[in-house]
């Protein structure tokens, strides 16, 4: 059986929304027994659509015993449903009736702060490396070549390059 893709589920959800809209319209224009059969038919259609969605989104009991490539889709823009993993925090946000975009924004801000901290540490270590190299060159001139090799290996510039630029 081919994997159920995200676009398939998207289509099923759109169908359900359409059924709900039709039911809303039928209830709004309810005229009594003459429109009752139409309303019953629309509710049955909604029930069928919900059952189909439930079947498509049910956890696959064979997932743990099958190969990992089973859920790969041929279209990377339309992944298989069971290959998508959402962070539990996003699900908690939605369960709490919060906007998942807030979680995304907070997560991005947290990552940016962490990156700034790491950048600061990297620059501090680079400055320390340069100060240490300068002091080692002046204290032990015979190690100048080895110090330059270490500086170059750790991403710094040799003393001669720093003096030019």
Curated annotation (Swiss-Prot):
Per the record, the major location class is: nucleus
What quaternary arrangement does the UniProt entry report? Answer: Component of the Mediator complex.
Please give the function described in this protein's UniProt entry: Component of the Mediator complex, a coactivator involved in the regulated transcription of nearly all RNA polymerase II-dependent genes. Mediator functions as a bridge to convey information from gene-specific regulatory proteins to the basal RNA polymerase II transcription machinery. Mediator is recruited to promoters by direct interactions with regulatory proteins and serves as a scaffold for the assembly of a functional preinitiation complex with RNA polymerase II and the general transcription factors.
Supply one GO molecular-function term. Answer: transcription coregulator activity
- How is this protein named in the record? Mediator of RNA polymerase II transcription subunit 10
* Gene Ontology, cellular component aspect: mediator complex
Q: List every stretch annotated Disordered.
A: 54-81, 143-165
As for subcellular location, the record says:
Nucleus
**Alphabetical list of Pfam families matching this protein:** Med10
Name the domain of life this protein comes from: Eukaryota
Q: Which family does the similarity line name?
A: Belongs to the Mediator complex subunit 10 family.
Biased-composition ranges, Polar residues, are 62-77
- One BP annotation, GO: regulation of transcription by RNA polymerase II
Q: Which UniProt keywords apply?
A: Activator, Nucleus, Transcription, Transcription regulation
